[in-house]
């Protein structure tokens, strides 16, 4: 995707979600999360009006609130990444904006296995969004992604179940549309917490990735970075 000619100096995208009840009640079906974005062309001094993209990136079943929110998937809690989205900088998917996310589906389940991580993306500067597949691990939750080399994407997710105290890593070779693999990286120990991942450079044909989290299986302590 080329740069948007209408904004030669670029735009900042701010993705966010709103809700009419707390997460616990939304998870039980007693509330709604909606998904939005705003943009700025002056480095965040002034922002556009919010654009509601709930119908494109979320699957709520709340027709009593909005008759169009009547998806059989019955997603309930929904959250964008606690950190940054990303825009692909190189190769086939250059320009694509990808936002990590997670949602719960249906009634609450034991050990938070109604939650799962996924994402959504746009190839036309926010006109149309598409939902990525869910990652293959129930209980995956807060997530953040970074661009790897050779058209690949890595997403790093929290394990809300808490049974394995390590980060969940998912790899995509098609820009985040689907996932080649999802697994627990037991070298990245974690106390059930969010971690941060960021592409910080490029050297010898490969992207350089920075990672930071609380590297402790019992408490949010022992800051680790690599």
Locations of regions flagged by a protein language model:
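Asp-box/BNR beta-propeller blade signature and adjacent active/binding-site loops
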Residues: 1-226
